[in-house]
Amino acid sequence: MKRADLSHPRVFNDPEWAEGYYKRNAKDIERVGKRFVKLLRNSGFESGRILDTGCGFGAVAIELAKEFPDIEIAGIDLGEPLLQLGQSLAGKAGVADRIAFSKGDVHELDFESNSFDVVVNTFMVHIVDAPVSMLNEMERVAKNQGRIMITDLRRMWLGLIVRKLRTAFTLEEGMEIIRKSDLRQGKYSKGPFWWDYMVGT
């Protein structure tokens, strides 16, 4: 199946569109957050600094903050309406004091090298202009013994029914992007609609 063009902008600057995106996708992304929590717990993680690259409305960051009280999270995104929504949702969840949302480009992270214990990325590889550049930046800011957690949609036959799956990469295409990047050795896996690449979990 040929990869389709995105049906939405790469950067969500329209407040109404951002609100609609949240309503359509909140539950799915919250489930990713819960899955990341489980993986981190199983790997022995308890505290530290986490960076959510392309955090959107903050669903993953909020799930992590709720489950790990001794962490600090930085969430970056270029979409200001999504960041504002994330701040509001974090406040309602009682974790706004531990998540710092800010506008930032995943291709040029404004953080020092070797500065985060965990770097996460959710459904962004197929959206950004230069995924290899984004992954290289994630590797740069992750600590030498840090964890890197990536999940993205997977193009497969269900894309005939679910259009957003047609815009994603296949598992093989995703792994080729990983191989072209500076990311350290990790583990590949796939779920019904997604693929994962995990380092240190």
Where do the PLM segments sit?
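Conserved class I S-adenosyl-L-methionine
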Residues: M1-G44
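C-terminal alpha-helical "lid/dimerization" subdomain adjacent to the S-adenosyl-L-methionine
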Residues: A4, M149-G200
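Class I SAM-dependent methyltransferase SAM/SAH-binding core
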Residues: L51, F57-E108
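A conserved beta-strand element that flanks and buttresses the S-adenosyl-L-methionine
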Residues: V120
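Short catalytic micro-motifs in class I SAM-dependent methyltransferases
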Residues: F123-M124
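A short glycine-rich, Lys/Arg-flanked "PGG" loop and its adjoining helix->strand segment in the class I
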Residues: V132-N144
